[in-house]
Amino acid sequence: MTDAPSSPCGQHEALLEALRQTLGAAAILRPDAHDSLDRYQVDWRKRYHGQALAIVRPASTDEVAAVVRLCARHRVSIVPQGGNTSLVGGSVPDDSGQQIVLNLGRLNRVLAVDAANLSMTVQAGCLLAEVQRAADEAGLLFPLSLASEGSCTIGGNLATNAGGTQVLRYGTARELCLGLEAVTAQGEIWDGLKS
């Protein structure tokens, strides 16, 4: 592992340049370059406010892994974010301006629906409403239902173990999950997907 520059400013600029090289400039949003990034830095109730070093929007699991490796190398903490609909502020950066918000909104696809095995493979940034729609189109039911289903994501549902309106009958989000593909804190991709 390469040592990061010692000064915070140099460390941050080196990280941001590495992120631009890895993801492209369009995937990196900076507070100083945009009028408002409140969508990423303030929760939907306007209760929790933060200031990020940058908002990073990867488009693949490999890009997520690369971001995690770069942030670890530069010792910059990450705040993972789905739809930013949480009630507890966990998806909002602190106000230090030194954290990267890792927004998974571009990882938003239903990859497969297997009606025979009653399973689906979806990306972490996929909206709950899209998962429900894909299941319905296959003649199935994805029973997790929340008021925020048009803006909350499956990754956030799993991270918070969302229950929803049918939790007593069908269980929580984690009980509806057969497996995961995840990126470890070291930036390695762990494949625990099953169908």
Label each region the model flagged.
Residues 1-69, 86-118, 133, 147:
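N-terminal flexible segment immediately upstream of the FAD-binding catalytic core
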Residues 109-195:
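FAD-binding subdomain of flavoenzyme oxidoreductases
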Residues 49, 72-74, 81-83, 152, ...:
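Short, basic and Ser/Thr-rich N-terminal targeting/leader segments
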Residues 11-22, 76-86, 125, 129-132, ...:
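Short charge-dense sequence patches
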